């Protein structure tokens, strides 16, 4: 039987993970490549994100450029963008639904079984959102590894994992765990716990008839 403390813990974890997914989607450090050119002074660090690519000079100045065409992007990057956006939208809906079903709120009425079902629905939506983000981060991570070990890829254009991927993985894990805790609000378990078997009392001897 889920209590309000467990629901609050799950909701907090899921919300924290959702904020991490927002940060991961926004920052451009999904892929990073640091290398020095012929001149040490012109050393550059290149980053690729979901929406833009950036170049950081050795002086610390960063210049970013949005992608010109969506159709020109690799398939893995397009799929990752779509999955991350879907994950963020589902996470927002899950927070709204879970808030109505939590025991510590007055939304959703006073019916405990109904609120438990609402909280469980919010937890399931959180799990779907976490899975979408996990697939997105793992997909582009697999693509980075494949390109890195491809002998046909020049050394100066090979990329490694950026911090955004690790933030995305951590956020996905928190959303999944938080959704799992909220999903423990199963109405069936509460109804069983609330059931009390009627007591049976022995018949009194005074009710016997004597002949």
Swiss-Prot record:
Extracellular side: 29-81, 141-160
Known tissue expression: Expressed predominantly in lung and kidney.
PROSITE patterns found in the cross-reference section: CLAUDIN
Cytoplasmic membrane side: 1-7, 103-119, 182-211
InterPro entries: Claudin, Claudin7, Claudin_CS, PMP22/EMP/MP20/Claudin
Native species: Mus musculus
GO biological process annotation, one example: calcium-independent cell-cell adhesion via plasma membrane cell-adhesion molecules
Residue ranges crossing the lipid bilayer per the database entry: 8-28, 82-102, 120-140, 161-181
Topology of the protein relative to the lipid bilayer: Multi-pass membrane protein
Biological role stated in the UniProt entry: Plays a major role in tight junction-specific obliteration of the intercellular space, through calcium-independent cell-adhesion activity.
Annotated keywords: Cell junction, Cell membrane, Membrane, Phosphoprotein, Tight junction, Transmembrane, Transmembrane helix
Family named by the database record: Belongs to the claudin family.
UniProt name for this protein: Claudin-7
Main location: membrane
Subunit structure: Directly interacts with TJP1/ZO-1, TJP2/ZO-2 and TJP3/ZO-3. The phosphorylated form interacts with EPCAM.
